[in-house]
Curated annotation (Swiss-Prot):
Subcellular localization: Nucleus; Cytoplasm; Cytoplasm, P-body; Cytoplasm, Stress granule
Protein's gene: C9orf72
Highest taxon of source: Eukaryota
Disulfide bonds, paired cysteine numbers: none
Name the UniProt record assigns to this protein: Guanine nucleotide exchange factor C9orf72 homolog
Region of interest: Required for the homodimerization of the C9orf72-SMCR8 complex: 461-481
Any one Gene Ontology BP term: endocytosis
Subunit structure: Component of the C9orf72-SMCR8 complex, at least composed of C9orf72, SMCR8 and WDR41. The complex is formed of two protomers, each individually consisting of one molecule each of C9orf72, SMCR8 and WDR41. The protomers homodimerize via an interaction between C9orf72 (via C-terminus) and SMCR8 (via N-terminus). Within each protomer SMCR8 (via DENN domain) acts as a bridging protein between WDR41 (via C-terminus and N-terminus) and C9orf72 (via C-terminus). The C9orf72-SMCR8 complex associates with the ULK1/ATG1 kinase complex.
Domain cDENN C9ORF72-type: 200-343
Gene Ontology molecular function: GTPase activator activity; guanyl-nucleotide exchange factor activity; small GTPase binding
Length: 481
């Protein structure tokens, strides 16, 4: 790392985080724009290591760089801008989220950033969406926290009759610390246990001599089918790390190389925490043989999730994309409303808030049995195990199967675009689509729709959204009688 001469500035508060394993992250920073001094760093979070890769002055210099030029920022209220800096001369990349907020009684511009070595660029890019989604929600909560602190401090000053306004917003740092640490832990776990980009089919169930060697045929069929129906997002739990990881690798065969790098294997010694945003992740049960998924993180996942238990061979799935996104948005709104109404820091802790309001009570039983059977995966499994194992035949057959699914998804998108004149008209008939594209089996339609959703986000809501919202509104009206 090249030597940088930091500008004169007061000492910046720093929190060192002890992480298990090697961290790819150099630091996370919270900076703000001072109308007199320009960009200033409020706080630094850095992994605790023996070797200091960046000094505090260098981190401050880099964090200040993210707010340079933001003095003329003219964004809509509530907007969050994502900036991606690649500073080759400094050997770092910076991902910064720029936003406006109230602090010390003034509206100003802030930046929440993470700094990584440039050598980690290929590692980070598949995880970019996960990190941005996490940081975005941190900012949503941070804005509320800053505004509440400002109101409380103004009231305190008025009551005490003081003329000097005290430093406000300081208590936002513990809240940010509690939210930034999980992001750092996620990146550290992905550094050590992410699924490799190039998977060997020999390490998966698809290399068995017969379909029932490693697991029951019906279980494997349900697992792969549901995995594809939920946009390739699955969580695999069990008591044996070896069994869990074998299923994880098997499911990752049906993902793209970039999506595999956004998946995580199970740790043999101790279990990781569930992380929303990963495509496939393996988790160990505790000593009692149980594992509880955190409702909040599951709801925050960008896609619905399949839950697979390798101990009892059960497969359950969340509702489809349009319903998941609908529930997710209502849940987020409910959580932020409860956060706003909280009257103390203890009440504002995420683990103590009851995420309900007058209009929305979340359904805690979000995982359902796999209701819709398919013919695509069943035909694939019937044929692939007839091929001789240990050769490249099965890998080639798998690639052909994935190509067919991709072509079907593209055909479905073009069919809908032509039928609706690229969204200008409402979609006419789902029945005709199923017949014309040979997707009469409900499971087949769900698989192709899920793949099409990843290619063209919002497709689910466009096709199923209006009938779903109408049925929800009708249900809400009936419940008022």
């Amino acid at each position: 790392m090249s030597t940088i001469c930091p500008p004169p500035s007061p000492a910046v508060a720093k929190t060192e985080i002890a992480l298990s394993g090697e961290s790819p992250l150099l630091a996370a920073t919270f900076a703000y724009w001072d109308n007199i001094l320009g960009p200033r760093v409020r706080h630094i979070w850095a992994p605790k290591t023996d070797q200091v890769l960046l000094s505090d002055g260098e981190i401050t210099f880099l964090a200040n760089h993210t707010l340079n030029g933001e003095i003329l920022r003219n964004a809509e209220s509530g907007a969050i801008d994502v900036k991606f800096f690649v500073l080759s001369e400094k050997g770092v990349i910076i991902v910064s989220l720029i936003f406006d907020g109230n602090w010390n009684g003034d509206r100003s511009t802030y930046g929440l950033s993470i700094i990584l070595p440039q050598t980690e660029l290929s590692f980070y890019l598949p995880l970019h969406r996960v990190c941005v989604d996490r940081l975005t929600h941190i900012i949503r909560k941070g804005r509320i926290w800053m505004h509440k602190e400002r109101q409380e401090n103004v009231q305190k000053i008025v009551l005490e009759g003081t003329e000097r306004m005290e430093d406000q917003g300081q208590s936002i740092i513990p809240m940010l610390t509690g939210e930034v640490i999980p992001v750092m832990e996620l990146l550290a776990s992905m550094r050590s246990h992410s699924v490799p980009e190039d998977l060997d089919i020999a390490d998966t169930v698809l290399n068995d001599d017969d379909i029932g060697d490693s697991c029951h045929e019906g279980f494997l069929l349900n697992a792969i089918s549901s995995h594809l129906q939920t946009c390739g997002c699955s969580v695999v739990v069990g008591s044996s790390a070896e069994k869990v990881n074998k299923i994880v690798r098997t499911l990752c065969l049906f993902l793209t190389p970039a999506e595999r790098k956004c998946s995580r294997l199970c740790e043999a010694e101790s279990s990781f925490k569930y992380e929303s945003g990963l495509f496939v992740q393996g988790l160990l049960k505790d000593a009692t043989g149980s594992f509880v998924l955190p409702f909040r993180q599951v709801m925050y996942a960008p896609y619905p999730t399949t839950h697979i238990d390798v101990d009892v061979n059960t497969v359950k799935q969340m509702p489809p994309c349009h319903e998941h996104i609908y529930n997710q948005r209502r849940y987020m709104r409910s959580e932020l409303t409860a956060f706003w109404r909280a009257t103390s820091e203890e009440d504002m802790a995420q683990d103590t808030i009851i995420y309900t309001d007058e209009s929305f009570t979340p359904d805690l039983n979000i995982f359902q049995d796999v209701l819709h059977r398919d013919t695509l995966v069943k035909a694939f499994l019937d044929q692939v195990f007839h091929l001789k194992p240990g050769l490249s035949l099965r890998s080639t057959f798998l690639a052909q199967f994935l190509l067919i699914l991709h072509r079907k998804a593209l055909t479905l998108i073009k069919y809908i675009e032509d039928d609706t004149q690229k969204g200008k008209k409402p979609f006419k008939s789902l029945r005709n689509l199923k017949i014309d594209l040979d997707l009469t089996a409900e499971g087949d339609l769900n698989i192709i729709m899920a793949l099409a959703e990843k290619i063209k986000p919002g497709l689910h809501s466009f096709i199923f959204g209006r009938p779903f919202y109408t049925s929800v509104q009708e249900r809400d009206v009936l419940m008022t009688f």
